[in-house]
């Protein structure tokens, strides 16, 4: 049986025989042909993908030479099994901080573009239920095309997971529609200021519905949020009750979405989960859109919009607003998976600052001094709350690890 170990000492001791090998006739010095193997199941040694024969098998070594050389691999040889190749390091792996920054920039950029284009559509086509359906429909088509080409590969869904995702999708649909009703009724900056109250509703739901103990420091950090939103609401020039109440319902809906999401934790990747939620939410949103806005749309809605901007622009605006809506949500999910909870929290706060600031600049919304101060206080409160909550979560994680 062939030996499986080639002793380094044997090889080193045979080095003086190099000159002897050099003087041997070519016919006697030639080594037997050695074939390169992708894998070796029994006998032989692999060095950089070449199989070496033990010294007992070499006719040259019988003449006193014990130096072994690997033969060149054949053209069809496969070195992958014998040599552990170092995978090339890509740009994203080499510069993780820069990559994360790029993800955040893309998330903010898509979010700002969506909010601006969305509000421009409402200025000439004030039908938020229908536009909400378009947002989800474009996203669903995008997901179906992605599944078709295998980017990503569709993850199968069973009845149990479907039952868990339906409540999440219903809350997502309600929160999405009411957000758009608010966007159509009031200034974008005001809607986002009211939606800054979402952490307050999350804390309340955790305390009184889930029975979780919320530290007093978290409750105190929410006081500036409530005060700031109240100040901004009292002097908001575009204020109306429809916009305010719709934004509040959106906060409650997204809070319940978070609760149901915790119950629907699964190993499925976030891209597939969001795709299934979008499909279910679309089915939920279609009936109210047809009932509430359908007759008016067929009578005057579509014709008025086409008369104002033209058919091509109208259709392209609806397509792109849906595309930006889906992409910003998907990139947000992918971004937040890359970072720690504290970075996640800061990112959410900065996103809202970006959207409020750009919407004021683009649309030239006039805001009173009190509204500006109230918005700033609310954003600062959200930042404080997010920081404290992230610290608490990190302490819990370290305690579990210990």
UniProtKB/Swiss-Prot annotation:
Cellular component, GO, one term: chloroplast membrane
One Pfam family cited in the UniProt record for this chain: TPT
Annotated TM spans: 97-117, 130-150, 208-228, 273-292, 371-391
Segments on the Chloroplast intermembrane side according to the record's topology features: 73-96, 151-207, 293-370
Membrane topology: Multi-pass membrane protein
InterPro entries tied to this protein: Sugar_P_trans_dom (IPR004853), Tpt_PEP_transl (IPR004696), TPT_transporter (IPR050186)
Top-level taxonomic group: Eukaryota
Transit pept. (range): 1-72
Keyword annotations: Chloroplast, Membrane, Plastid, Transit peptide, Transmembrane, Transmembrane helix, Transport
Subcellular localization, as worded in the UniProt entry: Plastid, Chloroplast membrane
Lumenal side stretches: 118-129, 229-272, 392-402
A molecular function GO annotation: organophosphate ester transmembrane transporter activity
Recorded family membership: Belongs to the TPT transporter family. TPT (TC 2.A.7.9) subfamily.
Protein task: Mediates the export of fixed carbons from the chloroplasts into the cytosol in the form of triose phosphates.
Quaternary structure, from the entry: Homodimer.
Protein name from the UniProt record: Triose phosphate/phosphate translocator, chloroplastic
């Amino acid at each position: 049986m062939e030996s499986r170990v080639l002793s380094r000492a044997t090889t080193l001791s045979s080095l003086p025989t190099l000159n002897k090998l050099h003087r041997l006739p070519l016919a006697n010095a030639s080594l037997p042909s050695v074939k390169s193997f992708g894998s070796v199941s029994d006998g032989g040694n692999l060095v950089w993908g070449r199989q070496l024969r033990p010294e007992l098998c070499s006719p040259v070594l019988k003449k006193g030479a014990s130096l072994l050389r690997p033969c060149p691999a054949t053209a069809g040889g496969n070195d992958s099994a014998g040599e552990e190749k170092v995978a090339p390091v890509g740009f994203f792996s080499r510069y993780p901080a820069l990559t994360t920054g790029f993800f955040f920039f893309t998330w903010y950029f898509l979010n700002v573009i969506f909010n601006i284009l969305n509000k421009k559509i409402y200025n000439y086509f004030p039908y938020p239920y229908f536009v909400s359906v378009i947002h989800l429909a474009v996203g669903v088509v995008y997901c179906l095309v992605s599944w078709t080409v295998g980017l990503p590969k569709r993850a199968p869904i069973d009845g149990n997971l479907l039952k868990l995702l339906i409540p999440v999708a219903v809350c997502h649909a309600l929160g999405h529609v009411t957000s758009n009703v608010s966007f159509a009724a009031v200034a974008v900056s005001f809607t986002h200021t009211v939606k800054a109250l979402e952490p307050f509703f999350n804390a309340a739901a955790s305390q009184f519905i889930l029975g979780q103990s919320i530290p007093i420091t978290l409750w105190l950090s929410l006081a500036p949020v409530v005060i700031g939103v109240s100040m901004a609401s009292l002097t908001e020039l575009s204020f109306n009750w429809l916009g305010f109440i719709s934004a509040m319902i959106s906060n409650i809906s997204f809070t319940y979405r978070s609760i149901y999401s915790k119950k629907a934790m699964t190993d499925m990747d976030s891209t597939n989960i969001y795709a299934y939620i979008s499909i279910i939410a679309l089915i939920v949103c279609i009936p109210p859109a047809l009932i509430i806005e359908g007759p008016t749309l067929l009578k005057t809605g579509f014709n008025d919009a086409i008369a104002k901007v033209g058919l091509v622009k109208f259709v392209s605006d609806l397509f792109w607003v849906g595309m930006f809506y889906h992409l910003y949500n998907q990139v947000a999910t992918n971004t937040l998976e890359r970072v720690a909870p504290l970075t996640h929290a800061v990112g959410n706060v900065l996103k809202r600052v970006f959207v409020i600031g750009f919407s004021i600049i683009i649309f030239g919304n006039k805001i009173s001094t009190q509204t500006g101060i109230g918005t700033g206080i609310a954003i600062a409160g959200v930042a404080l709350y997010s920081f404290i909550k992230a610290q608490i979560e990190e302490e819990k994680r370290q305690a579990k690890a210990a």
